[in-house]
Structures are given as structure tokens and as C-alpha cells.
Amino acid sequence: MSANTTTESFDCVVVGGGPAGTTAAQRLAQEGRSVLLLDKPGKIKPCGGAIPPKAINDFNIPDSQLVCKVAGARVISPKGRNVDMPIDDGFVGMVDRKDFDPWLRNRAALMGASYREGAYQGLERGTDGVPVLSYRPMGPEDGRNAPEVKVRAHMVIGA
């Protein structure tokens, strides 16, 4: 692939718009890097949604994103035995990932990252050695018939 067959170039492409990917995209954008955040729409991984107070503070997560604050947990075995576990630091904030993840992606975009919905297709090196990532845009349609898009990126993060 020649270096001029793609129209866009980014310092970094982050594949995956969950908490890790959006945090990476946001931090890089805040540092002035050009960032593309690519995420496949409509896919939320199974997750309990628990966020400890230190992470809430460190990542500036507003109370509006918390569904509730939990002060303890109980595990019940198949035989009916209970184990109660108090939570250190008083509580754990709970989020609903179907609302929380889009909020994180929007925050990364507000900080300067470009956000696109699409399905990762592959990664290769251009003739100049710079990685070229390909993806299929997705949105109202499922993306199967969308033409593949190729972008250059000096760094790719799989999140």
C-alpha cells in the first residue's frame, strides 16, 4: 500500500470505546495529539459497572453518571451460604454501561478526539512503514455494505 492512498492521518487510532479506550483517547487529545476513537456501535460487554471512589475522583466522573452507591456486597453460594463483604472507603459507585460508555466517548470527543462508529478490519504497514488501519463505517446500517476506510496512524491502541 502506498502512503498516499489514504486521506487521513492521525497520531493515534484507539480501537475500542469502553473506559480504557476513551480514557486513552481523551488523554492523548488533551496533550494535543490527533486521535481517532473507533468503536463498534451497540456492543456493551458484560460488566457489573462498579467504580471505586478513587477512580471516580481520579477520572472526574460526576455523580450524574452514578446509578447508585453501594456500601457492601453479598455473595450467595449454590448451597445457600452467604458471605457479606463490606466495601472499603464507604461505597462503590455503580454505572450503567449502556449510558456510561456513550458519555465517556462524548467526553473524549469534547476534548478533541474524533469519534467514529465502525468495525475494525485490519492493520498493515504502508510503504513508508507507518501503520494503516482499515475499518468499515457503521451507523443506521450494519456496515457490511459500507466501503472500507483506511487511515494512517503513527500509533494504534487496541482497547
What label would you give each PLM region?
Residues N4-G18:
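Beta1/beta-strand and adjacent pyrophosphate-binding region of the FAD-binding site
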Residues T7, R81-D84, G143-K150:
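Short, mixed charged/polar active-site loops
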Residues V13, G17, Q26-C47:
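Glycine-rich FAD pyrophosphate-binding loop
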Residues G17, R27, E31, R107-A159:
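Predominantly flavin-linked oxidoreductase catalytic cores and closely associated redox partners
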Residues G21:
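N-terminal Rossmann-fold NAD(P) dinucleotide-binding loop
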Residues C47-P53:
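N-terminal beta-loop-helix "entrance" segment that forms/cooperates
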Residues K54-L110, E117-G118, G122-R125:
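A conserved beta-strand/loop capping segment in the N-terminal third of enzymes
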